[in-house]
Amino acid sequence: MLQALNEHGVTPDMIIGTSAGALNGAFLAADPFGGANQLSHLWPGFSRETFFPGSAWKSVRTLRTSKTYLFPNDELSEFINKHIPANTFEELEVPFVAMATDVDTRLSVALDTGDLRSALLASTAIPVIFPPVERDGRLLYDGGLVANLPIRQALKMNAASLVLLDCNAPGQRDPYPDSMSGVLE
């Protein structure tokens, strides 16, 4: 989808992303012309192990020590450091916002300044799966909890037009798991 937009001359004035959309958005904001191509080569190479290392049962054992999450976000942090050249929002080519959710207020939080890595980790911190991220005195979780499609934020930033990308294949749905190990996978 991103490559098709690029090929048709659609270039964003700003990018706002939530969760995996924040990761994709950061790639595009860092490199508006090459980011889509880079993503098209990276995503197909990922497996469950890329971001969720270890067995399902090892993850359950993690709960005995962490109490709040199954997987540390170390692999994701390493991925961000390795593949996204910018360290801060200010280094990006296109204005970018990563959406997160404030644990205390349960409201969406627009992250658009300072450290990019912590913002991306916060925006992708799926509760129970990854740890929350502390940033600017707030504890933050995945932005998809309250702003999966951050249209309000785009309108607040005076976006004249919006392009929303739904990355789910039409009519395609994973089967429901039929065991605890299936849930953990």
Regions found by a protein language model. Name each.
Residues 1-80, 112-122, 166-177:
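Patatin-like phospholipase
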Residues 83:
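PAPS-dependent sulfation machinery
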Residues 86-184:
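Active-site gating loop/helix substructures
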